[in-house]
Amino acid sequence: MSEELLINVNSFETRVALIVSGALQEIHMARSSGYSATGNIYLGKVVRIVPGMQAVFVDIGLDRPGFLHAADIQSSLMIAADDLGDVAPTKTKPNIRSLLHDGQTILVQVVKDPLGKKGPRLTTRIAIAAKFLVLTPYKNHVGISQRIENDDERIRLYRWLRPLVEKTQTGVIARTISDGADERVLLEDFELLQRIWSTIQYDTKNIKAPNIVYTELPIQNRLIRDLVGKTTQRIAVDDQTTFLRIREYMQTYAPEFLPRLYSYQDDVPIFERYAVEGEIARALEPTVSLPSGGSLVIEQTEALVSIDVNTNGFVSGADLEETVFKTNLEAAMSIPRQLRLRNLGGIIVIDFIDMLESKHRQEVLAALKLGLEKDPCKTFCDDFSQLGLVLMSRKRTRKSLEQTVCVPCDKCTGTGSIVSAESTCMEILREIFARHALNEEKCAGTRVCIVTAHDAVIGRFLDEDAKFLAQVSATLNCVIKFKPNPAIVSGYFDIRFSDDSAL
């Protein structure tokens, strides 16, 4: 299995694609107009206690207060299992008022970004990640990634890390990539995390709440930290400034992977070269075709994600049971990739086609669970229910691909979605860049680019995205003009170049 990390950067957004064995596995986006707080640590202030929910709301300085449930409060009275450790929850459940009070300052970390009308989800179980280790400062505990299966290696890591934990009275978790890692790099990681924690403790004592005390890494550095490993063959970056910043980061924190860092300078945009743009477009469609003619229909709602498996009339020979089994098996192997690609999380209900034979159901379930084992996000998968459904969950920390790129459709009362005006603006700017690069000689004397688009898209260009428009125009030495067309749906547009400045 080979992996490549493709990093596409411009003035208005950063996109990172993970390619596994030639197929797009994950897509991450960070826009200049957006902000993700996941991973950030804040000194917050309790502003409201809700006993009925066993929760509090905490002001951390964002637009909306964060939500902190009692189960996410680190306490000597109640230590529940979290996503990183393996400590079982106790039966003691003290009242929320015995843990916190109004106006109390508290150190919290964002585990889920705001979504819809909900504020950020918070925890007091601080976890700070480095390349090989995760520091859990409030837990005197050594954890080893479950993906490290070799018993001798687990024992080696535990015996080496335990004295450090006892000395500092802080917990630590060995990440999957620490499998076989030299003790020197593990010590460097541990010392880095201790310095970060010391800085957080100092700032906490010297600032007033609400305030931020730790900021998660920029998207490109964070993904290099979290995704680059032994199977990574290449890290390609198409922006020189970003390339130099990443190289500087890797020289300090991941020097062993520096030979795999590559500056992409081809005229063909990097996402076009690797066919990523088409994969992103297909990932926004509800229907996914399966190899034998069946399909998945994926629908995302506020409450859950539903996945329906269909044969689409495909029949292999005369054995209907075998046809259904084959379609379900293909679906089970496809679903884990679709969850990662679309970044779907929360409760997921899968409606497989009914199978008569128990062994077929078990094989389908085994294939699904095997695919989920490769997912870096925490997942849980139950058995088939009496209704033939499979209920599973996937940890959700950030918006899904659809929530990032699309908005609810105003023509169907929110039951569907269309590409947002913001996403359309980003696509138009990328397209102008790409067409200019592919026709550089022809466009060298071009003075005007005419864009025909929906009124909402043009309105955004003249307001929120005006600075990005000006940057592109200056970079390409090209005047960009607009022709509104209300009949064009957001997500569609037309671009043409002209040397007639009177247009």
For each of these PLM feature ranges, what is it?
Residues M1-T123:
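Charged, low-complexity terminal tails
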Residues S2-L5, E26-A37, T90-S98, L115-L122, ...:
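Active-site phosphate-binding and catalytic loops of NTP-dependent enzymes
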Residues L18, M29, L68-V87, L122-A130, ...:
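P-loop NTP-binding catalytic core
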Residues M29, S33-M53, P89-P114, R154-W160, ...:
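Phosphate-interacting basic helix/loop segments used at nucleotide- and nucleic-acid interfaces
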Residues R31, D239, D351:
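Residues that line or immediately flank small-molecule/substrate-binding pockets and catalytic motifs
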Residues G52-V56, I60, R64-G66, V110-T136, ...:
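Conserved glycine-centered short motifs in functionally critical loops
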Residues D102-I106, K208-A209, R260, N343-G346:
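Loop/turn-to-beta-strand initiation segments
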Residues V142-E277, L284, C377, R398-L503:
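Charged, low-complexity intrinsically disordered tails
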